[in-house]
Structures are given as C-alpha cells and as structure tokens.
C-alpha cells in the first residue's frame, strides 16, 4: 500500500516516485497551492498539491486534520529559503499526483501539539493521544529496550520461558487480584504479583538460565511509579552467586544504554551497603547526582537541654541527623516554612535549623531559635561534622529513625531539585547487605524485607539466632538516579533453611504446607543453588525517556485509582455470570 514511511523520505529519494500513507498533521492553503504535512510513526513530510491536477487538488481542499490519506507523488528539493532544518525531511517535499482519502475524521478532542491536556482526557482518547510524536517515540524506545534486553540474554544462554497467569495466592506483600473458578465453586486463582516461585521451580527443573518479559499484578494504592498491572524483566540463573549475577546484569544494562541511548556506563557500578545508604542519604535508593548528605548527630544529643533532640537520641529506635545545604542561608523564612510543611508529610513534627552567617564570629555568627539549648561543645561538633561554611543552612531531623530517614531523605531530593544541584548524567548503584527482616509495628511481628525465599548471609539454619533485625540477606537492588530499577537475591535452596526462615516469620508448619507445599516438596529433590533479579521495565523506560510517570511509557495504563477511562474498566458483570461462578455481590450501603 505504501513504499516508504513519511519520516524516512530524504534527499536520497530525489526524483523518485513514492507512495505514502498517514494522518494529516496540518493543512495549509498558500496562494492557490495546498500544503499537507503527512504524519506517520516515523515522522512527517510536506506534500504539495497544485491546481494542475484539478481532481487531486479538489480532494486536497476537502481534507482536514487527522484524515487518513494515501498519497503518491514525486520527491523534489524544497525551494531555496523554505527548508526546515528542524525536520529530518526538511530539505525535501513530495509533489502529490494522486490522493486517496482512506478515512475522514471528526475534530479530535484535543490538538496533538497541545501540552496542557487533562490526563483523564488523554487516557479516555488514548488512541488519539498515542499519535503524539512524544508518545510514539517513547513506545518505540520501549520496543528497542525490550529487543536489546532479549538479544543480550539470548546471547548469554538464557531461555525465554512463560509461567502461569492463573496461579495460587501467596503472601508477597500486596493484595492479590483474584479470579473465581467456575469449575471449582468457591475457589479462586490469583494473578501473579511476580513469577517468583515458578522461576525457582524452573531452576529446580534444570532450565539453568531463564528470563521472561512478563505482566505482573498488584492490587495496591497507586503512585506515580505504580500500576495495577506492570511489566517486569524477570531473570533467574543456577550455579551463580551474587557476584556473578550482579556482574552479568551490569553488562546487560551497560549494553542497553550503549545501544539505545548511545550513553557509556562505566562498570563495575558503585556499591553501597543498605546501612550506609540509610545513614548518608536516608534512603535505600539514593540519587547520587545530588551532592547533599545526612550527618549523624544522635551520639552527641543525648544530654542537650532540648527534649526534641535528647528524647530521640536516648531512644534505641530514634535518630538525630543534620542536612547541610551549601549557600542555603539565602532561603527565606517562607521557604523554610514550606520545607517544614513538606517534611510534615513524612511524619516529621518540625524542621529545626541553623543559619551559618559568619563562622569566625562564633555563636554570634549563627542564627537559630534552638542555639540557646545547646552548649558550645555540641555546636562546635555540629559545625565540624557537617563541614559548615559561611552562608550555609543546616536542617535537623529528630524522631524515630524511620521518620527522620524518610523526612530528611525526601527533603534532600527536593532541595537538590529546587536549588539546581542535580548533576547531569547517570549514576547507577548497587545497594547490598539488606536486612533479612523488618519489624511490622502494626502486626507486631517480623516480616521479610524482600520475600521469604531470600537467602540469609549464613551457611546453616542453626546460625539464624539472635535478633532477627540484625540478620543480613543476600539481596541486592540496582538503583539508577534515585529510582530502584531492579531487585533480586540469592535464593534459599535447602528445605532446612527455608523452614527455619518460615519459623522466624511465624509461618507454622501447617501454614507453610498449605501455601508453599509444592516449593517445600521441590526443595527435597535436588535443588541447585540459584538466584535472580527482576527489573521494572516500565520504570527503566520512564527514566531512559525522561518521562515523569510510567503511565507515559505504557500504551494503555490505568489512572491512579486503577480505572481505565478508555474501556471504563473495572465494570459490573451480569447476574447470570455471577450465578455461574457461584458468587453473590453484597452491595455496599451508604454507611459502608
């Protein structure tokens, strides 16, 4: 039907006859000559129609934006002075000789070059939104990313193997999407939150190296980087420890950036322990492009006459930390109030500060309402530890360590962006030595920080003694510019170790048998040492395209309320369907 893409026609095609198909991006009538910018996936080209061909010209006069056309014509050089250097096709145009309207179009709900379009409207008319050049480029890059990753893994001996979509609910942290079974009334499948157990079973089945680009489902509250259904690059390999896995994944990501973005990433990637990341950045996914760090002050605040600081300093679960902002003394009182309100979202009760006006003037050169509570020795220690200089501002966080880390960690990122401190480029990082467990305060029990199949950094089950909060796992996360793009671990591969971890998590023998019996059985029959990783493909493409949300790199995403404006899903089903599934829906009343 066509000989070329619109965006691929160039000077090498001069004087050639081409057949093009696409949408009308714009139509202009200049002095009896009609110009149509014809657009397809690869770009647009200018087509010229003159009155020498009356029938063709008359058809061109009737054409409007977003009409679908087929054009046949000759490629020629644009007249001198009319070239468009911003277009790959800007040196040429096509003199139209035949024109067929393949379909007309109503006026679209928004212009494709309109920037401020309500997201609900964009998703409602996604088929129009997808025609935007920006969306086309993002999805094309997504395809290139997938192709490059597949090629690398295939070249390194990995097999693309599918795992079930209809499976059994397992406790993985988020709520499952469940699917009723018609043939087993009262029973339900669950859509997979990840292929975790199946990929481990593939290793037990001798598949050695597995990968899959797979859809995963989690029924959780949504944020800018979350969707109810999302795509993972899932990887598992046998007979390889964490050093081997991380090294291979570094090579894969380096190859990806070289091929798709033509950006060199230097290996090996930087590594940092979880404890160091939390101490220095208040986050287990620090953005290393921001040159701001937290400074530990807990050890010197226990005896100050200021309960806001001394209380957390004496609390084993508390923390007092500082965040020095170079030249932050220029921030106004309103700015500080705004940042105080910002950290309040993370549970912080306030945001104490010291402005450093003149270090040579001693206390007189400092400005802060909290100085009166601090002896000279503590003030000197704060200034020394933070490396304060004239013109700086020092913020403080004092509370439970979790709140301090979340509040100052988020403030660090916000200040970095607000003050233009974010360096250009890419800063990949491995975060390692994660805690094996964390304490769930609401449930009053220990839970797995990653998942209960992560191997601990001990050789024998009997070594799993002492405080669970101090046990270290063989887990690793890949972080890129402050976003976790991949997470994995070496897995437990013996029955005794798996049962010991279940016991620490309060999962009794009966519950373990009910939920994971198939895994426990498989471990008995010669399970190899194995490990793996999963990359969030949507997040990775979001970063590589410079997008603000993963919704911008997915063809048909849901809203932040897990609703699809295009299809109006989720929707009610008929009583007949419910009856066939042995389901009765209890309608919610106004009181809930």
UniProtKB/Swiss-Prot annotation:
Keywords: Aminoacyl-tRNA synthetase, ATP-binding, Cytoplasm, Ligase, Nucleotide-binding, Protein biosynthesis. Signal peptide: none annotated. The keyword Nucleotide-binding applies. The record marks 30, 81 as: Important for tRNA non-discrimination. GO terms for biological process: aspartyl-tRNA aminoacylation. Its EC number is 6.1.1.23. L-aspartate binds at residues 172, 218, 450, 491. It is found in: Cytoplasm. ATP binds at residues 218-220, 227, 484, 536-539. It comes from the Bacteria. Its main location: cytoplasm. It catalyses: tRNA(Asx) + L-aspartate + ATP = L-aspartyl-tRNA(Asx) + AMP + diphosphate. GO terms for molecular function: aspartate-tRNA ligase activity; aspartate-tRNA(Asn) ligase activity; ATP binding; nucleic acid binding. One of its GO terms (cellular component) is cytoplasm. Residues 196-199 are annotated as: Aspartate. InterPro entries: Aa-tRNA-synt_II, aa-tRNA-synth_II, aa-tRNA-synth_II/BPL/LPL, Asp-tRNA-ligase_1, Asp-tRNA-ligase_1_N, Asp/Asn-tRNA-synth_IIb, AspRS_core, GAD-like_sf. Belongs to the class-II aminoacyl-tRNA synthetase family. Type 1 subfamily. Aspartyl-tRNA synthetase with relaxed tRNA specificity since it is able to aspartylate not only its cognate tRNA(Asp) but also tRNA(Asn). Reaction proceeds in two steps: L-aspartate is first activated by ATP to form Asp-AMP and then transferred to the acceptor end of tRNA(Asp/Asn). Homodimer. This is Aspartate--tRNA(Asp/Asn) ligase.
């Amino acid at each position: 039907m066509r000989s070329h893409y619109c965006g691929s026609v160039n000077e090498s095609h001069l004087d050639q006859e081409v057949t093009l198909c696409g949408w009308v991006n714009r139509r202009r009538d200049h002095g009896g000559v009609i110009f149509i910018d014809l657009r397809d996936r690869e770009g647009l080209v200018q087509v010229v129609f003159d009155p020498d061909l009356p029938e063709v010209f008359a058809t061109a006069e009737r054409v409007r934006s977003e009409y679908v056309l087929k054009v046949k014509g000759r490629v020629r050089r644009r007249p001198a002075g009319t070239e468009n250097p911003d277009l790959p096709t800007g040196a040429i145009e096509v003199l139209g000789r035949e024109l067929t309207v393949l379909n007309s179009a109503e006026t679209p709900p928004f212009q494709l070059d309109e920037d401020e379009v309500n997201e609900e409207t964009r998703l409602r008319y996604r088929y129009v939104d997808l025609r935007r050049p920006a969306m086309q480029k993002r999805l094309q890059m997504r395809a290139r990313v997938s192709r490059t990753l597949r090629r690398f893994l295939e070249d390194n001996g990995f097999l693309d193997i599918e795992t079930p979509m209809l499976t059994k609910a397992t406790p993985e942290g988020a709520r499952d999407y469940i699917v009723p079974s018609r043939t087993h009334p009262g029973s339900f499948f669950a859509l997979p939150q990840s292929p975790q157990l199946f990929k481990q079973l593939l290793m037990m089945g001798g598949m050695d190296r597995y990968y899959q680009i797979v859809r995963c489902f989690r029924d959780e509250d949504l944020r800018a980087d979350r969707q109810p259904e999302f795509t993972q690059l899932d990887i598992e390999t046998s007979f390889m420890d964490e050093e081997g896995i991380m090294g291979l994944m570094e090579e894969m990501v380096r190859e990806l950036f070289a091929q798709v973005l033509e950006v060199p990433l230097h290996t090996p990637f930087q590594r940092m322990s979880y404890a160091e990341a939390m101490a220095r950045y208040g986050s287990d996914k620090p953005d290393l492009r921001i040159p701001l760090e937290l400074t530990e002050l807990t050890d010197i605040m226990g005896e100050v006459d200021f309960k806001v600081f001394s209380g957390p300093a004496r609390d084993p679960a508390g923390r007092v930390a500082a965040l020095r902002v170079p030249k932050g003394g220029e921030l106004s009182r309103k700015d500080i109030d705004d940042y105080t309100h910002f950290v309040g979202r993370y549970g912080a009760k306030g945001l104490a500060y010291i402005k450093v006006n003149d270090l040579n003037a001693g206390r007189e050169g400092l400005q802060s309402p909290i100085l009166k509570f601090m002896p000279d020795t503590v003030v000197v220690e704060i200034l020394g530890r933070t490396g304060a200089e004239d013109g700086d501002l020092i913020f403080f966080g004092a509370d439970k360590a979790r709140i301090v880390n979340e509040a100052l960690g988020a403030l660090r990122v916000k200040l970095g962006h607000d003050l233009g401190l974010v360096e250009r480029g890419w800063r990949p990082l491995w975060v390692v030595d994660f805690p094996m467990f964390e304490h769930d305060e609401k449930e009053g029990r220990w839970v797995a920080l990653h998942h209960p199949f992560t191997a601990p950094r001990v050789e024998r089950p009997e070594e799993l003694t002492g405080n669970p909060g101090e046990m270290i796992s063989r887990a690793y996360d890949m972080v890129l510019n402050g976003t976790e793009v991949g997470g994995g671990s070496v897995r437990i591969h013996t029955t005794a170790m798996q049962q010991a971890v279940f016991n620490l998590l309060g999962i009794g023998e009966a519950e373990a048998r009910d939920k994971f019996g198939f895994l426990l059985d498989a471990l008995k029959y010669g399970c190899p040492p194995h490990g793996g990783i999963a990359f969030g493909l949507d997040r990775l493409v979001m970063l590589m395209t410079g997008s603000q949300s993963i919704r911008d790199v997915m063809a048909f995403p849901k809203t932040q309320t897990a609703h699809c404006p295009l299809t109006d899903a989720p929707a009610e089903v008929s009583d007949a369907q419910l009856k066939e599934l042995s389901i009765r829906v209890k309608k919610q009343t106004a009181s809930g």
